[in-house]
Amino acid sequence: MLNLTNVDDALHKGEEWLETNKKTFLSETETGISFKDNFADLLLLELSNRWDYPVIVPEDYPEDNDTNAVAFSILKPTDSRAKVLIDEILACKNADGIVQVHLDPNRPRIAPEVSANILSLFYSYGRGHEVQESLSYLQKAMALEEYQESRYYFLPEPLFFYTWRLLCIASGSALETIDNQRLPKELHTLRDHLIRRVSARLGTAKDNALCPALRILICHSLGIKNDVDLQLLLDLQEDDGSFGRAWFEGLDPSSARLHERGLHAARKTENNPRPPSDMQQRIHDPQMQYARWSDWPLAPSIARNDKGIQHDHHTLGSLESPRPSHDLLLLHH
């Protein structure tokens, strides 16, 4: 049986670690190159509701539909500004009607994780009916018994998380809640797939704290008892309150793995003051372009593209480079 005192202590230690390390969550390669990842920062912002934890980084967003979709579903700019982006995304459908990963039509790639994030954006603006082909593609991926590793992800939990996030948004609920009464009927099958897939993964990936953390979030909102993953997290917490290194995604095209300590610590704790009103005003400032956040604090950023992983205009890898015999480990600290 779980000791609730241990759970409370773990939450307190995790919150202290987040507070102590706010604005310092950097990615780092094993060769010592550090960078900020805006995609992880956006998810950290949504989960913690703390504007002072991440630094929302890029002077320009990377040219991919995934990051833009996540950003706009979290930051909620004006409807007119969002319409411009949504219309651009709609122009990126492939021959099957599935929205592609990149804004560039010369990069014809799709991924179920990206489809889930794009669907979240469209449903948040009442336009889910325009991307039903992407929904069908996501449902087929979730219907599988085994996870099919993709170019961008190597574990099923990120797919589960993005799907769960879609269900929360589409039902008009706050994150961490799925309102089954308001959930659109076309998403009921997707919800059932999520319940089945997550239930089958309980207690797995014992060396990656992010996996049980995501499953706990999902199970809580779906009414699934999950003490086994909670115990896993308690066992994985380190003395400083963090939860160690937890791999989250791969960096196309090098198959390098990404880890964000701040992001997965936030997924295990709750600390939710409201963002300051002046930041909300800046989001809705008519002078602010939809893909530009130049008035926000800037930090080195990476751009994920097929020409290589860019950092401060220096290429770290390229599509033509042979795949290394072992993964290049990219560690967010």
Swiss-Prot record:
Coiled coil: none annotated. Residues 312-333 are annotated as: Disordered. Residues 323-333 have a biased composition (Basic and acidic residues). It comes from the Eukaryota. Pathway: Secondary metabolite biosynthesis; terpenoid biosynthesis. Its EC number is 4.2.3.-. Keywords: Lyase. It catalyses: (2E,6E)-farnesyl diphosphate = (S,S)-drim-8-en-11-yl diphosphate. It is an enzyme of class 4 (lyase). Terpene cyclase that cyclizes farnesyl diphosphate (FPP) to drim-8-ene diphosphate used by vviA as the native prenyl donor to catalyze the prenylation of D-mannitol on C-3'-OH to afford sporulositol A. Belongs to the HAD-like hydrolase superfamily. This is Terpene cyclase vviB. It comes from Viridothelium virens. The gene is vviB.
